[in-house]
Amino acid sequence: MKHFLKLLDCTTEEIYELLDLAATMKQYVKEGKEHHFLKGKTLGMIFEKSSTRTRISFETGMYQLGGHALFISAKDSQIGRGEPTQDTARVMSRMLDGIMI
């Protein structure tokens, strides 16, 4: 499993691959082509504090890429009952394709 926490964790080759993919995706949008790179993928979004812009940007991005985003607030999860965010994320990672904290 590859975690993307910061750019410094990536090799130069991985950074170039990300930039190439971003350029391809941008070109698809410009040309009006279908670009469902995340079709069938589900992202769990864990929020300890509400963030409207972050939630909307991730939900919109997942939708545009053909995937689904699930919003999980602290009060709707074990986080609201004192469980560490890392434990909740570990359990959720067994059922989801990606987790955004």
Each language-model region and where it sits:
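Active-site cofactor/substrate anionic-group-binding motifs, chiefly glycine-
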Residues: 42-43, 47-98
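Positively charged, low-complexity intrinsically disordered leader regions
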Residues: 1-56, 60
